[in-house]
Design a protein with these regions (language model features):
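N-terminal Rossmann NAD(P)H-binding glycine-rich loop of SDR-like oxidoreductase domains
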Residues: 3-23
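Structural motif
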Residues: 4, 48-49, 84
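NAD(P)-dependent short-chain dehydrogenase/reductase
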Residues: 122-176, 182-183
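Active-site helix of classical SDR
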Residues: 111, 115
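Active-site loop/turn elements of alpha/beta-hydrolase fold enzymes
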Residues: 33, 55, 90, 136-139
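Conserved Rossmann-fold NAD(P)-dependent oxidoreductase catalytic core, especially the SDR/UDP-sugar
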Residues: 73-109, 132
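NAD(P)H-binding glycine-rich loop region in Rossmannoid oxidoreductase-like domains
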Residues: 36-73, 77, 92-93, 97-98
Length: 184
């Protein structure tokens, strides 16, 4: 029997790519964030793993607020079930540098990374060993969705080309950027 996976984030770059990569291997469904909360407890109780790929614009840009923490809201709904949750955190929770490891120094600088670290702690507290935290790098790839203009934040490439168009080459102040292809 195939594992049942539910991906939340039907309109997201990561969610769509994850769904397409896993659809032949698992019994997988993809829904948007609002639709997730309309799923019955009966159906949720049969899910093995939930992966949230949706995010609030306010979560990215503003100070932490529980109402903007979609992962925590999902956690609250699934806490009573036995399903696991995969949390997509960020390598930005670490002090900038190369060769980062799980035990590298944590030093989030922006609201996004500070919020991710707070969510990690809240999910770990609530779900204990039922949460897998992945501190992923910058994901790049071709966005085949029709929602390209619905970006929550700019990528390194977006910023780079924005400056190039203005004939500005910027110094990265020893900030490290790492990129992983979405389809590898």
């Amino acid at each position: 029997m195939k594992k049942k996976i539910l991906v939340v984030g039907k309109n997201s770059f990561v969610g769509n790519n994850l769904y397409n990569e896993l659809k032949n291997l698992f019994d997988i469904k993809i829904v948007n964030y609002k639709s997730f909360f309309q799923i019955s407890d009966y159906k949720l109780s049969s899910i093995d793993t939930i992966i949230n790929c949706s995010i609030s614009k306010n979560y990215v840009h503003k100070n932490y607020s529980i109402k903007n923490d979609r992962d925590l809201q999902i956690c609250k709904k699934i806490k009573k079930f036995k399903c696991k949750m995969i949390f997509l955190s960020s390598r930005k929770v670490y002090l900038s540098g190369n060769n980062l490891r799980e035990n590298s120094k944590l030093k989030p600088k922006c609201n996004y990374s500070k919020n991710k670290l707070k969510t990690e702690k809240r999910l770990s507290f609530n779900l204990k060993k039922r949460v897998l935290i992945l501190r992923i790098s910058n994901l790049i790839g071709i966005d085949n969705s029709k929602l390209k203009k619905k970006k929550i934040h700019k990528t390194f490439g977006d910023i780079f080309f924005q400056y190039i168009k203005k004939n500005i080459i910027f110094d990265n102040n020893k900030e490290y950027k790492d990129f992983i292809s979405i389809n590898k």
